[in-house]
Amino acid sequence: QRQMCIRDSYNVVESQLAVQPLKWKVWGICKESCFHGIRVLHVPQKKFRNTFLRVLGFVYWHIISFLIGLFQRNIDVILSPSPPLTIGVINIWLAKIKGCKTIYNVQEIYPDILKRKDGLVIEQLRRMERYVYNNSTAVTTIDQVFYNVIAGRFKDKSKLCIIPNFVDTELYNSQGGNVECLNPHFFPATDSLKLLYAGNIGYAQDWEPLICLAEKTKGVSIEYFIIGEGVMKPVLEEKVRELELDNVHILPYQPRSLMPSILAYSDIQFIFMNPEMEMQGFPSKVYTIMACGRPLLVCSGKDTPIINFLQEHGCAKLITEKSLEKKVGEMADWLNSVSKSELALLGRNGVEVIKRLYSKDVVTQKYVDLVEAL
């Protein structure tokens, strides 16, 4: 029986504390919980607004996690989800001390995803990236585009393989959404076509097409819902006020348990990728949306990870046009003409793909096979 240690950081979901209570293992240092019979150690980390304190907290988490790892026994494999790269580094050191294997999972390509492309810091990050790739026992990445980008950075490409992300179909499925439990102040019952985005409101998304699309369809029975937080939220809110876009609703994060209902409330889920970052990331929410039977409206360039993934499955309207005016026009025309039956077909196609290829059981088995092959 292999023992696996998974090293990552998480946000606390208050609704989960009742079913997975945390108790202090070492007071002030780490907590312990049980997840379906699996012992989990948690290193609490405060979120500071001050940059220096955030860096200090980041370093503290790495040191404490490394020390905790040293005291774990009978570890066969350490799985390191990324980012950040530094998790991969300390886990390689830990694996050498413990005499175990390491798997590094590439979810985003660092430092490629960063806006700066040169300088001393970027050069050091590139060296760190290659160190992690070449000193891990195995490296997994989520799709062929990512594989093609990073394969040349390996001395031994045979250790790199593709294992996609998955969705928990027990929580997210086309039968799981009850819109009656939603707050009617945030989610009113209307006959309008509802487009929705839930997640980080940051730089990875391109918000200009959304504002232009909302302005172009103003007065039409179409509404746009944006749920989340992030650095671009104040910018969006200011634009909505400036242009008097009553058809755009910007809402705070909602409880995770409500997400199936929120997805059911929407007619279409939209994702508009930032052209500067669209090659380095794949929004995992795509799987969740498909599992819940919702069609997608996606703006991204040709041959990007999200376009390459979706174009084979018939579950999304894909916009690859570069011109802002043309892409907004194409989206507006589609929204004004698409029927409910066409949207339902796109949604059903997505559900079938998830069940066949991207369920929790299917993807987990791929990791089991990888671990046993090490």
Language-model-detected regions and their locations in the chain:
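Nucleotide-activated donor-binding/catalytic signature segment of Leloir-type glycosyltransferases, i.e.
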Residues: 221-228, 234-260
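A short, well-ordered alpha-helix in the C-terminal region of glycosyltransferases
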Residues: 341-357
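Acidic anion/phosphate-binding donor-loop and adjacent secondary structure
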Residues: 116, 151, 167-185, 191, ...
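Carbohydrate-associated surface elements
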Residues: 145, 163-166
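Membrane-proximal helix-turn-helix segments that form the acceptor-binding/catalytic region
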Residues: 70, 86-89, 93-97, 120-141
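Short, small-residue-biased leader/transition segments that mark boundaries at the very start
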Residues: 1-6
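Nucleotide-sugar-dependent
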Residues: 205, 255-262, 269-290, 295-308
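Conserved donor-binding/catalytic core segment of Leloir-type glycosyltransferases
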Residues: 187-205, 210-214, 225
